[in-house]
């Protein structure tokens, strides 16, 4: 990735942040700003809200498969987001990291009616925290350049420590001018241009009433030269953002398993300690005109131990209405409406336009706190964490299509070998139908290899799997 470096400019500078919310037209209630603190809170309270996702992939049998969820080809983060290799002059290959769970974009919001300083640290005992912004004071485990660029870093006992974080409420940026309308307009212009510009997915998460977070990048013991771009990394800069962001990959079990039978019907079994407040089944299919069609159904509750079967799914004819349904579920879990809409806007493309079958449910907060302990000092009066589990499932028909693609590739390979008359042949490109699966192509090939009946298909699946893995390691 060709990194670009930005300095925090004065408030009056034009940094042009794009505040994009594509998920749905705001409701009438949304036109008014969220009340920063709940009615039961005092003006001195600190409220913390967080949302994010855990993504897994399984075959129709429900067994979760390893994949390489962080390959650069599938990353959509702005250049200013930091990673573990930053400052080491290292072309760190995230594509070498394998895991069963991708932890995507947890963003942590802070609500306060006065400026204050806090300390923030997050731990991931069974994972590796790989990317973050603003910069942290320290992270564990220490980055090992040799391991990170060869076999891939070990997953486990990871943490990020932002150290001291200054919180600045939006009200602090209201200009002292006599006309209230002018003051309001000027404040909005200032707020919309304070943060670094990023892509639509990242900046959508900023559309809330949360306080700004300000950090100061730590100074290294000696200047670090980036060997790739040839410039000096000069920390000590101030960073301003609307939230704390981090991402990672883990190896742990989530409480719910999804399976698909021969008819395509999807079932859930909850092996956790608490019932779930609902789950959505979403299918995105390729339409007759080539555009994706969206199908959905929902179960109101997923009890512990008893299988739950989805009916449907049913064609979504009004996407905005469906997005509102998702927003309502997130709000019922404790998020503010603007936060819920920001989350849906962030994930709209990935959740609702990528071809496939997926189940969504909200992880109980007790489970989130165990998987991903968050420490904030002083302790907030309220902490709400809503992590959405996304279970990507290969249906029987999906598995059949992948097997057919692999079989066709095997036939074409045999024909090329015959035509070459014993001469060496060049490696053919991976079939487009497999590449269309993105980061899920690797586990799909692994699943196909395990269920294929013909030896030629198993052999071809192995070849394609090796080819894909080699390509991912170079990205």
What does each model-identified segment do?
Residues 16, 25-26:
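Intrinsic disorder/low-complexity segments
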Residues 26-475:
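Protease-labile, long low-complexity intrinsically disordered regions enriched in Pro/Ser/Thr
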Residues 20-22:
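Sec/Tat signal peptide C-region and signal peptidase I cleavage site
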Residues 1-9:
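Bacterial N-terminal signal peptides that target proteins for export
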Residues 9-18:
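Bacterial N-terminal signal peptides
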